[in-house]
Amino acid sequence: MLKITKICLASSATSTAQRSIALTAPRAIDQKWRAAKGLPENPNAFGPLTNLPDYTYLDGRPTPLGANQKRRLIKQQEIATRIVELSGELEFAKQRHERLKANAESEKQRLIRSKLKPKGHFLLKK
């Protein structure tokens, strides 16, 4: 018995066990079907369950915004202001580029006009 145990221990020490590690997480949602239907990848990111209030008053009073609704609204407002700011900067950069291009062209024309002056008998004809 002791001899068998020693053999088992010796053989287990020399053999190495290989372990595979999965590097990608499995997708629980069929993404191809959702893309074909025009739906977002995450069904909880957008839709009536996330955008509409949880309840309504029967007398028609507006329902207060939920915490996540308020957070999403504030985030969307920040994104909108950032878009307006960046589009203004882009328009300014376009105008500046056109202005610099026109200035460079006029400077080039001025240099050409100053270099090419009539000389000799062409100067006397005027």
Curated annotation (Swiss-Prot):
Complexes and interactors: Component of the mitochondrial ribosome large subunit (39S) which comprises a 16S rRNA and about 50 distinct proteins.
Recorded GO CC terms: mitochondrial large ribosomal subunit
Gene Ontology molecular functions: structural constituent of ribosome
Organelle transit peptide: 1-28
Predominant cellular place of this UniProt entry's protein: mitochondrion
Coiled coil start-end: none
Top-level lineage group: Eukaryota
Protein name: Large ribosomal subunit protein mL52
Family: Belongs to the mitochondrion-specific ribosomal protein mL52 family.
GO-annotated biological processes: mitochondrial translation; translation
Species, as recorded: Drosophila melanogaster (Fruit fly)
Keywords, alphabetical: Mitochondrion, Ribonucleoprotein, Ribosomal protein, Transit peptide
InterPro entries the record matches: Ribosomal_mL52
Name of the encoding gene: mRpL52
Compartment(s) of residence: Mitochondrion
Source taxonomy: Eukaryota, Metazoa, Ecdysozoa, Arthropoda, Hexapoda
Keyword Nucleus found: no
